[in-house]
């Protein structure tokens, strides 16, 4: 592959063209009067969206230098989405503003390293000021407001608020496509795992084909149970207590399964057997989660425990268990609260440390099952195109709401960034460092300016009035009114605003300190000469 190089001003200007192309496509979506962007999909219907990171990921430019510039801004959107889950359009607008202003100064002779120091200094002060202005999210109504602003839909905000209220802030909220027109919320309380009863003869309700156990005992083991004699001493103790038992094992088979079913049908005792969830190491971890939730002890060779020696005090308990053909749901396990809290803290640490998206998702599911439950928002729409667009908006709104619960909220509509303008302007600096601070100062007004322009207004006029307004007072572009943003529920999560600013500044600083760009130039394939026709061939 042939490489081509560009240096200094040539390199930066070529990359800037790419930055502008991507940012201009993304920034039309910002604000309540932002527009949509249509993305061509090769094998499906076009996707209509206003989600910044989704648009950014689709952009691939022909010129390799311009494409590198676009990829840098794409990285801003990706990183912001990864950390905060929303605010990708704001981050893109901030990055473009810093890069454009910074490049003017570099072209005029400013030292990029000095500019970088100034940018870093200004962003640090701005982030501190954002946290000072931040307010905690304290009630269901405020959670609904955050979701509604992000999705531009009050109904979506309400669904997310209800879901978080029912499953807790650490609970899993999943978004699925519905077959109908309406969007619905479905909540599964307690721990649910995707394993059902091993025999339909174990059901307690033959109409619903469900086994419902009240105040059951739990036998949790990673062993295969083939012989009924292995568990008979334990079952005799359970029968004396006149309570049902749920057996969670690697497999219940042969003589053991037959006798459990026969005794169930005779009415001797009620026992339901289910396979242990997960596979390999994940199975062991999930069995430990279940044991901690119910107060059971895992019967495993790792601890030198055998089924024949198991006693009733090694079993867990819960207020209720429901077992269907496919799922088992445990409600209100009787495990020790301190042990559950310790397990939750351990899972949170593992989530922070893991670098695998798949592992993170599985750990979050386990955390939710221990901490609260699972809520499913089933998205409905009239067409597939609308369904995809609506699903993306709900995903952003959910991420935004989680971020708000974590770090609080600030005034929305770009107001929070202008509110820290004064603090940043008070930074004492000289020369190129001062210029770097000024680059950030100008960028802080860019989101408000763009929101106003998308609403068909003059951005500069709105920005100047906002600089002189009381903190928290901002411009509501949806109604063209000046209001107290927090009181009106026009809010942004502090984490989203902070992440957008930090990632935009990071990429802008790297861009400005770039002096050479190396691009791969695809080699042109020379057309092969046509082969002569063979005798007898057409």
Curated annotation (Swiss-Prot):
What Pfam families has UniProt attached to this entry? Cpn60_TCP1
What is the top-level taxon of the source organism? Bacteria
GO annotations of cellular component type:
GroEL-GroES complex
Positions binding ATP in this chain are 29-32, 86-90, 413, 476-478, 492
The question of whether Nuclease is a record keyword is answered with no
The catalytic activity of this protein is classed by the Enzyme Commission as: 5.6.1.7
Predominant place of localization: cytoplasm
Question: Under the GO molecular function aspect, what terms does this record hold?
Answer: ATP binding; ATP-dependent protein folding chaperone; isomerase activity; unfolded protein binding
Q: What's one GO BP annotation on this UniProt entry?
A: response to heat
Q: Where does it live in the cell?
A: Cytoplasm
Question: What reaction gets catalysed by this protein?
Answer: ATP + H2O + a folded polypeptide = ADP + phosphate + an unfolded polypeptide
The UniProt keywords, alphabetically, are: ATP-binding, Chaperone, Cytoplasm, Isomerase, Nucleotide-binding
Matching CDD domains, A to Z?
Answer: GroEL (cd03344)
Q: Which InterPro entries match?
A: Chaperonin_Cpn60_CS (IPR018370), Cpn60/GroEL (IPR001844), Cpn60/GroEL/TCP-1 (IPR002423), GroEL-like_apical_dom_sf (IPR027409), GROEL-like_equatorial_sf (IPR027413), TCP-1-like_intermed_sf (IPR027410)
Describe, as the record does, how this protein assembles with itself and its partners: Forms a cylinder of 14 subunits composed of two heptameric rings stacked back-to-back. Interacts with the co-chaperonin GroES.
Q: What does this protein do?
A: Together with its co-chaperonin GroES, plays an essential role in assisting protein folding. The GroEL-GroES system forms a nano-cage that allows encapsulation of the non-native substrate proteins and provides a physical environment optimized to promote and accelerate protein folding.
Family recorded in the similarity comment:
Belongs to the chaperonin (HSP60) family.
**Official protein name in the record:** Chaperonin GroEL
Q: Where does this protein come from, organism-wise?
A: Staphylococcus aureus (strain NCTC 8325 / PS 47)
Q: Which gene underlies this protein?
A: groEL
